[in-house]
Amino acid sequence: MIKAKIAAALLAGTMLAGTAAQAADMPGEGVTVRPVVQAYAEEYFQARILFRALEDLGYTVAEPEEVVAQTAHLALRTGDADFFTAHWNSLHNTFFEESGGDEVLERVGTLLSGALQGYLVDKSAYDAGVQNLGDLSDPAKAAMFDADGDGSADLAGCVPGWGCERVIEHQLTEFGLRDTVTHNQGEYNAIIADTIAREANGENVLYYTWTPYWVSGVLVPGENVEFLAVPYTSLPDGGTANTEFEGKNLGFAVDSIQVLATDEFLEANPAAAKLFEVASININDVSIQNKKIADGEDTSADIDRHVDEWIEANRAAYDGWLEAARAAAE
């Protein structure tokens, strides 16, 4: 009888130890997290890397809501989502403040650093003297980029709600370009596909883009296109930022992309908070993956495979994120 009691006690102790170990490995067990994302395949890669890490910590990741960046920020403010993986620190600052700012939200870590935006033209136009956005105040130079015959330069621009449209609209007025430049907005992939086709046909092109994104793997800065400078730094609402990159003023902040989460979620989930703090992905890895999407590997299964491949190639760093997150939950 005594031996039986001892055995039962040992078994109970082993079970408790196992339960404790499981809880330590899976601090998110029983918690469902609600991400919000933009509806663009090119942003799903880095988001799903974080989703996978959250799942490895025991969290259940709900199907993400797909909205534009401005609405994503508001979704956090209203409590309809817990976190957003594509907050540009400078570009989206207005959205951040409009959604409650530091009182309800927190920017966590730096998921991607060195993100760029800017205006570009084809190499032949650049070599012919169009090297600054301000040059387009000259009607003759602006006409070089007239795609529809109205005499105005056609700028392949930014989708409303992304944030970049505010900068472009501000600068067109600031630099006196309203009479010579038309900001074409709509579905970006359609607009840029037309731009790429026209450049391939030897036509002059003027467009906005950003990195990380696959476009710069097709229209390659320094090869077949060049970034334009701007006359001086001027951002909406009197904003200030470093807009210089490699000696050229691009007009947009040299930015970092962070996870944005609600204070309430971070306080309740220290493991997730630490994960967001330490997770970091090389921006070139995202550009490489985005090029795969552009080349046809664009299904959800393809993106999941890209995530698998990235995790295996970066296993030590990825496991380090999980270890730090688990330690934070103890």
What function would you assign to each model-found segment?
Residues 40-41, 59-74, 183-194, 212:
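Short helix-initiation/N-cap motifs at beta->coil->alpha
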Residues 104-157:
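A conserved helix-loop-strand patch within extracytoplasmic ligand-binding domains
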Residues 252, 265-266, 273-274, 278-330:
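C-terminal functional modules
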Residues 81-85, 159-234:
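Ligand-binding pocket segment of bilobal, Venus flytrap-like solute-binding proteins
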